[in-house]
């Protein structure tokens, strides 16, 4: 047996070689939480429990320490790596393994993307008995400094010498003592320590539990969740910090609807989709994609797959602030955007006017988790659908399309592009679209929207004759 390899691994202890008491395990695969998966062997050489090992990679032989035992499986963390994987790499971030923001920095980027592609394929097969006719090339881009949205926890910790501002520690309610972050844009990472110092000076430092940040093309917004009003001295400190770091402060005293800009007032968050000549203003609490560079590529691919023509009528479901709706309106005759949030549909309408495509768009607010075949009928006939649901997926929409197909009572879109942030709900909905609504799964592929995490974003194309 080879010597233990002291590599940087989340949760690992590398005080020395593996002891005789630490069990040894060969890792076969990764699960959806980026844990190594292997099967223990009992004293008779027979397969035993499945072991999920944090910090282990496929192809590795490790020793491990279990922290949760169940009849059929155990959860564990790496103790030592006896045979490292060729996919293992040294994490760039000094706080990896403690901070819960990333789970895959120890895995080569190409391997990260390949594993996510396999997760997508496995979900489609195991949950829906489907294989795509083609697997699209993965969409990927910069792997560092990409995270343009984040929610940071603020905690006054006397034992740490003051205020902490950062992500939670891995599987913990504690806040990581982080002074930089490699996945945040460099200017935001450099702001973490000054932000701590700012909060320490505020009168409400122990009554401000959260800071939400959103990076736009011209300004970075920081939303302070304030449980009590700030005083005049606080206002001065915030203005000075905003001027020094070129940020805009917003205050949120209660729920999301209470968010309002504080200072400065003459700037506006936005992002752009240059390929389609779109400028998209948004509020810092609106849903927008975390990774602006990848979003541009994703929108371009989605529209090329959907292939809208000038005479087409297109339905954009879960349209948000118009991320796909507005580019579609540059190409199609009419685009109807449906979204569950009235706030977001109002923003989408304003954005359509801002970009001069309001003559080709209309928007409505509907609960798409309860939509029926009758609801789709009432909207009229559409040539194509674009569907971009949250993690819960588009079950009601898929069921409604299946019902229409089986009843033969209405036209169905010839093509559907489905953008997913959860491969299991995509697979579930794909099963309905293919097995019950008569579509073919023409292609699918991953979108590496969140490098160094186990999050799997994907895109799929369905067609029906």
Swiss-Prot record:
GO terms for molecular function: 4 iron, 4 sulfur cluster binding; iron ion binding; RNA binding; rRNA (uridine-C5-)-methyltransferase activity. [4Fe-4S] cluster binds at residues 93, 99, 102, 181. The keyword Cytoplasm does not apply. S-adenosyl-L-methionine binds at residues 289, 318, 323, 339, 367, 388. Residues 12-80 form the TRAM domain. InterPro entries: 23S_rRNA_MeTrfase_RlmD (IPR001566), MeTrfase_TrmA_CS (IPR030391), NA-bd_OB-fold (IPR012340), SAM-dependent_MTases_sf (IPR029063), TRAM_dom (IPR002792), U5_MeTrfase_fam (IPR010280). CDD domains: AdoMet_MTases (cd02440). Coiled coil: none annotated. It comes from the Bacteria. Its EC number is 2.1.1.190. It catalyses: uridine(1939) in 23S rRNA + S-adenosyl-L-methionine = 5-methyluridine(1939) in 23S rRNA + S-adenosyl-L-homocysteine + H(+). One of its GO terms (biological process) is rRNA base methylation. PROSITE patterns: SAM_MT_RNA_M5U, TRAM, TRMA_2. Residues 1-20 are annotated as: Disordered. The active site is at 421 (nucleophile). It holds the Pfam family tRNA_U5-meth_tr. Belongs to the class I-like SAM-binding methyltransferase superfamily. RNA M5U methyltransferase family. RlmD subfamily. Catalyzes the formation of 5-methyl-uridine at position 1939 (m5U1939) in 23S rRNA. PANTHER family: 23S RRNA (URACIL(1939)-C(5))-METHYLTRANSFERASE RLMD (PTHR11061:SF49), RNA M5U METHYLTRANSFERASE (PTHR11061). This is 23S rRNA (uracil(1939)-C(5))-methyltransferase RlmD. It comes from Burkholderia thailandensis (strain ATCC 700388 / DSM 13276 / CCUG 48851 / CIP 106301 / E264). The gene is rlmD.
